[in-house]
């Protein structure tokens, strides 16, 4: 059994250290049976992309999209909780900078994110673990930390209900604040919260997250997922999401097409990036894209391979990043210099948003340091090929690279050999939010 000790991220004000005793009675307005009767939350029912038959097509109209209602709802409710003092610190006061270099890694100094918590022991060699109701889970959050219910509607129409009962017989998916935010608008999407699902990907839940990315209609709103063994803190199914008004380095990396599924989903490998990763995009519909990624994730879970997911570009791109940092840490194989930073490379860090806890690390942040840290999380080339072969077998695809002209795609104009680490090249801004530069729903 492999274990590591680390300081867990506090996502709720009701999250206690392991071993802390519960007070007599509930003492809070939670989602348990003691408090649920009469509970109400706004309900946002988004367009059902499956039932509406919407497909992914290219638009050439350079039209700035209007602010989506979901975006205004998320930020409005988040700001309300900020004004009510529900967050552990003011994330808007955290210093942030783009690290000089070709990749544009983003560094944030966040000294308050892990304060006043003891290191906790985590098992890191078992991706699938049973839900344990005795430990903190999202039924124990205070209702004031919940923003709204979110679901795919019955048709192609968006519906919003300002005050809807929470139905325990029909477990709702909810959006809640993360009280230790990384960025403005940092929230949690918790699918079917009352079903108490463990942290594992299933087709329905990933599609819900893709629906949310599409409905937000903002390329700077991304959703992320961490499996157990890849720095998930809570074993209760959830995704994270926030706004960052710049492209992630992961999104700018050049790619090489590997294969295309029968349903038209293109699968590519990232080149010249410190963590070996796959990019899924295209397909006949967003459900086809989501289901393809789900099939791969279920395969990785069943084979005990930790991974992270980034849902990008309004749900049109999904990055899958198998990783091994926690395993290497447990085996004593991570360099002491990297361990001293106390950075846990979860989905946001692997995507290029480095959340640093020490001022000296922030002031000395460099592209080489960021690369060195992230490279510790990457599978070896041989192991990555084994993992992709497993995943491709699960979706009935070959993992033989297609020998076609133009399969190496640069996200910006560049020169040099992308396969040589000494000549790292990558993309520039992938989008500025205009319909001319990204796939849009018609």
Curated annotation (Swiss-Prot):
Optimum pH is 7.5. Expressed in leaves, stems, roots, flowers and siliques. Highest expression in green tissues. Induction: By jasmonate, ozone and high light. Circadian-regulation, with a peak in expression at the beginning of the light cycle. It is found in: Cytoplasm; Nucleus. Its EC number is 2.7.7.69. GO terms for cellular component: cytoplasm; nucleus. It comes from the Eukaryota. It catalyses: GDP-beta-L-galactose + phosphate = beta-L-galactose 1-phosphate + GDP + H(+). GO terms for biological process: defense response by callose deposition in cell wall; defense response to bacterium; L-ascorbic acid biosynthetic process; L-ascorbic acid metabolic process; response to heat; response to jasmonic acid. InterPro entries: GDPGP. Disruption phenotype: Dwarf. 20% of the wild-type ascorbate level, due to the partial redundancy with VTC5. Vtc2 and vtc5 double mutants show growth arrest immediately upon germination and are not viable. Not inhibited by dithiothreitol, N-ethylmaleimide, phenylmethane sulfonyl fluoride, ascorbate, L-galactose and L-galactonolactone. GO terms for molecular function: GDP-D-glucose phosphorylase activity; GDP-galactose:glucose-1-phosphate guanylyltransferase activity; GDP-galactose:mannose-1-phosphate guanylyltransferase activity; GDP-galactose:myoinositol-1-phosphate guanylyltransferase activity; GDP-L-galactose phosphorylase activity; guanyl-nucleotide exchange factor activity; hydrolase activity; mannose-1-phosphate guanylyltransferase (GDP) activity. Its main location: cytoplasm. Belongs to the GDPGP1 family. Catalyzes a reaction of the Smirnoff-Wheeler pathway, the major route to ascorbate biosynthesis in plants. Acts as a phosphorylase rather than as a transferase. Uses preferentially GDP-L-galactose and GDP-D-glucose as substrates. Lower activity with GDP-L-fucose, very low activity with GDP-D-mannose, and no activity with UDP-D-glucose, UDP-D-galactose or ADP-D-glucose. Highly specific for inorganic phosphate as the guanylyl acceptor. This is GDP-L-galactose phosphorylase 1. It comes from Arabidopsis thaliana. The gene is VTC2.
């Amino acid at each position: 059994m492999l274990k590591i000790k680390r300081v867990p991220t506090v996502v709720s004000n009701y999250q206690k250290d392991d071993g802390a005793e519960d007070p007599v009675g509930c003492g809070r307005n939670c989602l348990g049976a003691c408090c649920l009767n009469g509970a109400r939350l706004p309900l946002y029912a988004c367009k059902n992309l499956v039932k509406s038959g919407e497909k992914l097509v290219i638009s050439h109209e350079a039209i700035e999209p209007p602010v989506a209602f979901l975006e205004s709802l998320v930020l409005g409710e988040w700001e309300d909780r900020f004004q009510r003092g529900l967050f552990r610190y003011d994330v808007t006061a955290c210093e942030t900078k783009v690290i000089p270099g070709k990749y544009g890694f983003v560094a944030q100094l966040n000294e308050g994110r892990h304060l006043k918590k003891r290191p906790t022991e985590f098992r890191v060699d078992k991706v699938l673990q049973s839900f344990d109701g005795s430990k903190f889970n999202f039924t124990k959050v205070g209702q004031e930390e919940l923003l709204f219910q979110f679901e795919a509607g019955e048709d192609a129409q968006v519906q919003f209900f300002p005050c809807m009962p929470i139905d325990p017989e029909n477990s709702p998916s909810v959006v809640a604040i993360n009280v230790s935010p990384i960025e403005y608008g940092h929230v949690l999407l918790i699918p079917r919260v009352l079903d108490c699902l463990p942290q594992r990907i299933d087709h329905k839940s990933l599609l819900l997250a893709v629906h949310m990315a599409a409905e937000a209609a903002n390329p700077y709103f991304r959703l992320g997922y961490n499996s157990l063994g890849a720095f998930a803190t809570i074993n209760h199914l959830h995704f994270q999401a926030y706004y960052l008004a710049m492209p992630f380095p992961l999104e700018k990396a050049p790619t090489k097409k590997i294969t295309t599924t029968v349903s038209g989903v293109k699968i590519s490998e990232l080149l010249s990036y410190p963590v070996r990763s796959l990019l899924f995009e295209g397909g006949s519909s967003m459900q086809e894209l989501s289901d393809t990624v789900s099939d791969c994730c279920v395969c990785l879970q069943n084979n005990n391979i930790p991974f992270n997911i980034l849902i990008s570009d309004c749900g049109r791109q999904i990055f899958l990043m198998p990783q091994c940092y926690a395993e290497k840490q447990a085996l004593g194989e991570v360099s002491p210099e990297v361990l001293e930073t106390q950075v846990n490379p979860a989905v946001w860090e692997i995507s290029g948003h480095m959340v640093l806890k020490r001022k000296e690390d922030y002031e000395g942040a460099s592209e080489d340091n960021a690369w060195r840290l992230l490279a510790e999380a990457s599978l070896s080339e041989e192991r990555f090929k084994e993992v992709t072969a497993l995943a491709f077998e699960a979706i009935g695809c070959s993992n033989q690279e297609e020998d076609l002209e133009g399969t190496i795609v640069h996200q910006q104009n560049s020169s040099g050999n992308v396969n040589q680490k000494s000549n790292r090249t990558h993309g520039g801004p992938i989008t500025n939010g205009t319909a001319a530069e990204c796939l849009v729903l018609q």
